[in-house]
Amino acid sequence: MKLTKSRLEPMIDASIGNKPAPMLEEFRGFVKQTSGYGFAVTLAEPYYVKTAAEILHPLGKKVCTVLSYPLAGMTHETKMLQARTAIADGADELDISMDLSLFLSGRYEEAKEDMKGFVHLTQEHNVLMKMIYFASRLSADDQKRAAQMAVELGIPFLKTNPGFGAVTTPGQIRFIKQHYAGMIQVMASGGVRIAEDAMAMVEA
């Protein structure tokens, strides 16, 4: 499978990468730079969603933000407020961390119920939702359990990891596809920095 620029760009959510706390002018410059490419979306921290939308929406480009980041250790009400604010500010997509503490404590139904409110909210506002499920922190059984939860909730995308502080492997992508192909899409996040990394994920 030949990797071309036009084929690869729509698969990428552009992020500022290893600079998680950019200054305003740095972020503006990053957004303007991404606007010249065919990326699926440009990622913005919640504070910068409105800034990104002001630049990108007139160009027909989309904005994504991450919520309850990185480990979802907030109350459900706080996370829902954050989601509503992001949508009002112009977010077209929301990457939402499942509550890792609940999940690893075996409180799966509570973790599922926590995600359910986001599913309803994003469907109501026609906003794409991706669930961050922390593949690098989970056993194989727990990866399947998280994927099953997302499928049952009707979440369209799984995102392997937070983009900062974790590395996704092609094996993690293959694992989800092996068990849930056709039921949910999976996006690699974390450690995908060069074309060779991206190609390995596409081939997985």
Regions found by a protein language model. Name each.
Residues 1-84, 88, 145, 149:
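Conserved N-terminal beta1-alpha1 strand-loop-helix module at the mouth
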Residues 7-11, 40-41, 60-64, 93-95, ...:
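Structural preference for beta-strand elements that scaffold enzyme active sites
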Residues 13, 52, 86, 131, ...:
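Conserved, mostly hydrophobic/aromatic
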Residues 31-51, 69, 94-113, 160-168:
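Glycine-rich, proline-tolerant flexible connector loops at the mouths of alpha/beta enzymes
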Residues 46, 50-71, 108-130, 152-153, ...:
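Alpha-helix-loop-beta-strand connector modules within alpha/beta enzyme cores
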Residues 74-88, 138-149, 173-182, 186-188, ...:
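Catalytic cores of alpha/beta
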Residues 81-83, 87-134:
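Hydrophobic, well-structured mid-protein blocks that either form specific transmembrane helices
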Residues 100, 105, 133-174:
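Glycine/Thr-rich beta-alpha phosphate-binding loop at enzyme active sites
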